[in-house]
Amino acid sequence: MQSAKEKISDMASTAKEKLNIGGAKAQGHAEKTMARTKKEKKLAQEREKSKEAQAKADLHQSKAEHAADAQVHGHHLPGHSTYPTRATGANYPPGQI
């Protein structure tokens, strides 16, 4: 169940990232069209690349958060706890045997 939730969250993050990249490309294209000099066009292209890289970094960050959530909320089988449920050694006082 948790892995399915993680996959769905990852798919949502991927869709959001693609929208952000598409928006950055459209905005960059508009800026390049409005630019008059080669220098302005180059600056617009650099801003477009920067926004795309930021969107990809956000995707990786959200995927890491989803993976961390999956580890925190991991399912334990009954009787298989992560801590000892009883004493593991002999319960006799030293020197009594």
Swiss-Prot record:
Domain of life assignment: Eukaryota
Basic and acidic residues bias spans: 1-19, 42-68
A GO biological process held by the record: pollen tube development
One Gene Ontology cellular component annotation held by this UniProt entry: cytosol
Region of interest: Disordered: 1-97
Pfam families associated with the record: LEA_1 (PF03760)
InterPro entries: LEA_1
Induction (record text): By dehydration stress.
Keyword set, alphabetical order: Coiled coil, Stress response
Residue runs in coiled coils: 34-63
Other facts noted in the record for this chain: Under water deficit, the N-terminal region is necessary and sufficient for conformational transition from disordered to alpha-helix folding. This conformational transition is required for chaperone-like activity under water limitation.
Family: Belongs to the LEA type 1 family.
Function, in words: Involved dehydration tolerance. Involved in the adaptive response of vascular plants to withstand water deficit. May possess chaperone-like activity under water deficit. Binds to negatively charged membranes of liposomes. This binding induces partial folding of the largely unstructured LEA18 protein, vesicle aggregation, and leakage of soluble content from liposomes.
Stated name of the protein: Late embryogenesis abundant protein 18
Species this protein is from: Arabidopsis thaliana
Gene: LEA18
